[in-house]
Amino acid sequence: RQNIYGARTIAGLTVDAIAGQIPELGKYVRHYDYVVAQDGTGDFFTVQEAINAVPDFRKNVRTTILVRKGTYKEKIIIPESKINISLIGEDGAVLTNDDFANKKNVFGENMGTSGSSSCYIYAPDFYAENITFENSAGPVGQAVACFVSADRAFFKNCRFLGYQDTLYTYGKQSRQYYEDCYIEGTVDFIFGWSVAVFNRCHIHSKRDGYVTAPSTDQGKKFGYVFYDCQLTVDPEVAKVYLSRPWRPYAQAVFIRCELGKHILPEGWNNWGKKEAEKTVFYAEYTSRGEGANPKARAAFSHQLKNLKGYEIETVLAGEDGWNPVKNGNRMVEVKR
């Protein structure tokens, strides 16, 4: 008789043997180093336990973790030493918590925006697929679902759910890539310092307000770039700006995006900072939909004539030539 761990091992060996005999099946086989399951059928009950088990600074190989279907209420931290992690979710894998900025910590102090996050990602070369990152605190002020400081972070088919300040792109030297993701929130729910690309994402506003609040550092060539994204709202929402500048050198560019009628004609807001109009870079390229109104846009914004210099591989290249579009599959390969 085999227990669940032995059964999984035998199954894995069997699949490997079949794939070895029929090589064309190999591309459909995905190996997992750890499995997280609430019902005890995996290696760990919680995601944090699996993260903690990953060897520090495991180079030249990825550690792949499968998260079984379920709602995991945890405050997850992926420290800088846990490099090259792939977190893969079954349908219905939700990582959630309900902290918020004005909630008190054990010392009676406010947690603050940064302290409110449900998940913190510091380790470079992190990959997540089919995971829901959620802050379930509701409309109580700042309540971050995911705080990303990692460089070369790649999110595919993930969901980011919250209200105010859902996605905090925190790392000043961080490059982040979001592909086919869903992000919802209120106020300016995508915010921070990082260079971040959103490709074919669905961006959903739950209240009037702003989609983004970049805090791009002076001298940075890029900030936020949205490619072929769809911007939608709840039925009662009618007045949303594409962005307002958290810091004076904020950058946000929307390329070929479908803008709903909730996007105001002026499109961009200066957050009451007239001087920032001279230093921000806000731009669009062939926006479409009822919210596309290039002639009425704020005078300090731009309409790009072409996309030279705004290729995804250019925006994210940095000094190491990172190109998640070309090399994305390497993010999920596991050496045997």
Annotated model-derived regions:
Residues 25-336:
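Sequence-level preference for short, compositionally simple segments enriched
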Residues 1-24:
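Histidine-centered active-site loop/cap adjacent to the catalytic His
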